[in-house]
From Swiss-Prot:
Any one GO MF annotation of this record: rRNA (cytosine-N4-)-methyltransferase activity
Sites where the protein binds S-adenosyl-L-methionine: G35, G36, H37, D55, F82, D100, Q107
InterPro entries linked: RsmH (IPR002903), SAM-dep_MeTrfase_MraW_recog (IPR023397), SAM-dependent_MTases_sf (IPR029063)
Species of provenance: Chlamydia felis (strain Fe/C-56)
Protein name: Ribosomal RNA small subunit methyltransferase H
Amino acid sequence: MSEAPQHIPVLVNECLSLFADRNPKFFCDVTLGAGGHAEAFLSAYPSIVSYDGSDRDTMALSLAKERLEKFGNRVHLHHASFEDLAQNPRENVYDGILADLGVSSMQLDTLSRGFSFQGDDHDLDMRMDTSKGTTASEVLNTLREEDLGRIFREYGEEPQWKNAAKAIVQFRRHKKIITVRDLKEATTRVFPSYRLRKKIHPLTLIFQALRVYVNQEDVQLKVFLESAMRWLAPEGRLIIISFCSSEDRPVKWFFREAEAMGVGKILTKKVVMPTYEETRKNPRCRSAKLRCFEKKSS
């Protein structure tokens, strides 16, 4: 596969339609990526005078800067995690906030980042922000079997979590797990034969779990959800796109709790998913789920 980064924003039309009845002025995109959603919003809504875009990934920010340059001073870019953004003292500001969770096609296709199980000879890094933090390789070589099992179970919901953790610990006794190939070799006998025959790679859930743990995505998401409600202007709308149940579940329950407490209302009573046409063009979006919450008027 090519190392050339690609970026295919998902559920773009569905995101845009959630603001069809209004003219947003201030927008916040906390997972800017290469700027696909940002470009769509800025083009569709000339009313947006300030689009704050942030990301932990400096490579993504560089691409977004180039892509969004045509919008001039309407765009403001920031290198920041959700926890960094939580320090933002702003309240009741944004008409719209967008979070597109998980890993992007661009990150998957840049095999040197270690997010994809297709890059056999590349190191298992998996950090969104490569300037700091622990790599997936370091996690695999240092954590106890019990802790690895918990990660695979909680963050990947991997049925073979116990066997996978055991196999990894046994393998690293004679060889460190550095590359994608090493992890494949370590887990070669973990998965039942029917998993090996499926289109979805058997290591998908293990990779997901490692990525979530390495980037503390569960902690980051909790911090973001609490901050977003503070940032939203009255009648402001929060859109969250998730790609797995460990991301979608906390969003769903947070929205339900916020609605029950009178903070606002859930606009997507049924989760919004990609159309057949979109999944045909971009198979990676097949598991995407969109939820939207509107803050009360006052």
